[in-house]
Amino acid sequence: MIWHVQNENFILDSTRIFMKAFHLLLFDGSLIFPECILIFGLILLLMIDSTSDQKDIPWLYFISSTSLVMSITALLFRWREEPMISFSGNFQTNNFNEIFQFLILLCSTLCIPLSVEYIECTEMALTEFLLFILTATLGGMFLCGANDLITIFVAPECFSLCSYLLSGYTKKDVRSNEATTKYLLMGGASSSILVHGFSWLYGSSGGEIELQEIVNGLINTQMYNSPGISIALIFITVGIGFKLSPAPSHQWTPDVYEGSPTPVVAFLSVTSKVAASASATRIFDIPFYFSSNEWHLLLEILAILSMILGNLIAITQTSMKRMLAYSSIGQIGYVIIGIIVGDSNDGYASMITYMLFYISMNLGTFACIVLFGLRTGTDNIRDYAGLYTKDPFLALSLALCLLSLGGLPPLAGFFGKIYLFWCGWQAGLYFLVLIGLLTSVLSIYYYLKIIKLLMTGRNQEITPHVRNYRRSPLRSKNSIEFSMIVCVIASTIPGISMNPIITIAQDTLF
C-alpha cells in the first residue's frame, strides 16, 4: 500500500515537472528561436552521420553553415524588440545580449569554411568536429543571455567541455594531448573558484540567484558592502579571468594555442573572449553595482598586466601561434578598458566595435596560418621568410591582418583602438589609455618584424619550406581562402561602415 502511494506521488511529481517544462518551452520557446535552430542542426547532423556514408560530407558542411546563417537571420529579425526575461528568470533577451550572440555566430560561421581543407588533409573525424563547434556555439549563446547564477555556470561549462575535446582532437599529437591536459586542469580549477564566488554572492543576497534579484537581496539584507561581497568579487574575477585569459590567468593560453589544431585555435581565440566579455560585463555591472570602485580597480590591474606582459613576451616568440597567443592576451587588455568604462562615455559601444574588428583581424590571420601550415607543414616564424615571392596574395593578406592587429591607419584595428582609447580617456582612465597606446606601438614592432620576413627577396634568407611552396590547384574552390578574403576585407575597409557599426553598438544598453 505504501509502495503504491509512493509510486503514485512519483508519477504525479514527474507529470507536474514535465508539464511545467512543456509550458515554459511552449510560451518561451520563441525567445530562444536562434538557439533552437542550432539544436535542430545538431540533430540533423547526427541523423545524417548515422544513416549515410562518406559521400555525404558536403551535406554535413551545408547543414552546419546553414543552421548558423539561419540563426543569425533569426537574431537580426528580432533586433530592437523589447527586452524579455523568460524561463522563470533564467534567460534574458535584449540588444546587448543579442549583439554578442551575433558575434559568436559570426565567428563560428567563418570558422567552418576555415576548417574544411584542414580536416580533409589531416583525416580527422568530421561529424564530431562540427558537433563540438555547434555545441560550443550554443553554450556561448546561452551564456550571453544567462540571467541567473546557475545558467551562468552551466552555459560556459558546455562551451568549455567542447573546447577541451576540440583542443585535443588530434589525439596522436603529443603537444595536443599536453595542451588538453593543461586546459582541462586549469578549467576545472577555475570553475571551482567561480562556483565558490557564486556561493558567497548567493548567501549574501539571502538566497537569490537571478542577477537583478541579487541586487535587491543585497539591499534587503544590508550586505552590499560586507566582506562577503568582497570575497565573492575576488573569486568571481579569478574564475572569469580564466575564460578571458588576461595576465596573470594566461598560463594555459600559449600551450593550448601551440598544441591545438589551428582551426580550433582560431575558433577558441575569438568565441571564448566574446562570450566571456558579455558574461563579465553583466556580472560586474549588475550584482556588483555597489562595489564598482573595487571591481574597476581589479580590472584595471588585469588590463595593465595583460597589455604589458602580453606584448612584451610576444616579441620573443618563434612560433606564430604562440606569438598570437601572447598578442591575444594584450588584446584582451584593450577590451577590458571598454568593460571598465561601461555605459557612460560609450564604453560598451567601443568594446563591441573593437571586438567585431578583432574577430575579422584574428580570424584572417589564422586563415593565413592554416593555409601556410597545410602547404609547408611548419609554424615557425622564420619559415615565412620570402613568402611574397611564392604567394603574393597570401603574404599581402597576412600583412594586412597583422598591421590591423597592430592598429596602423587606415585599417580597422586603428579605428577600433582609437574609439576605445577615446572612450577610456573621456572616462578619466588616463593611465590605462597611455599604457594601451604604448603597448600598441610595441605590438607594431613584432608585427612589422614578421612582415619584413614575408617581403624579403634575398635567396639566402628564404627557407626550404618557402622554396618548395606549392599553391592549391583548386584556388577558386578553396574554402579557407573564402574566409580569409572576407576577414581581410573586413579588416581593411572600416571607414565606410564605421558610423553604422558605432550606432548599432550604442543601442545595446541592458
From Swiss-Prot:
EC number: 7.1.1.-
Reactions this protein catalyses: a plastoquinone + NADH + (n+1) H(+)(in) = a plastoquinol + NAD(+) + n H(+)(out); a plastoquinone + NADPH + (n+1) H(+)(in) = a plastoquinol + NADP(+) + n H(+)(out)
Pfam families xref list: Ndh2_N (PF19530), Proton_antipo_M (PF00361)
Keywords: Chloroplast, Membrane, NAD, NADP, Plastid, Plastoquinone, Quinone, Thylakoid, Translocase, Transmembrane, Transmembrane helix, Transport
One of the protein's GO biological processes: ATP synthesis coupled electron transport
GO molecular function annotation: NADH dehydrogenase (ubiquinone) activity; quinone binding
Cellular compartment(s): Plastid, Chloroplast thylakoid membrane
Top EC class for this record: translocase
Cellular component per GO, a single term: chloroplast thylakoid membrane
Membrane-related topology note: Multi-pass membrane protein
Keyword Signal: no
TM regions (residue ranges): 24-44, 57-77, 99-119, 124-144, 149-169, 183-203, 227-247, 295-315, 323-343, 354-374, 395-415, 418-438, 484-504
Family listed: Belongs to the complex I subunit 2 family.
HAMAP family associated with the record: NDH1_NuoN_1
Role of this protein: NDH shuttles electrons from NAD(P)H:plastoquinone, via FMN and iron-sulfur (Fe-S) centers, to quinones in the photosynthetic chain and possibly in a chloroplast respiratory chain. The immediate electron acceptor for the enzyme in this species is believed to be plastoquinone. Couples the redox reaction to proton translocation, and thus conserves the redox energy in a proton gradient.
Assembly behavior: NDH is composed of at least 16 different subunits, 5 of which are encoded in the nucleus.
Protein name: NAD(P)H-quinone oxidoreductase subunit 2 A, chloroplastic
Provenance organism: Spinacia oleracea (Spinach)
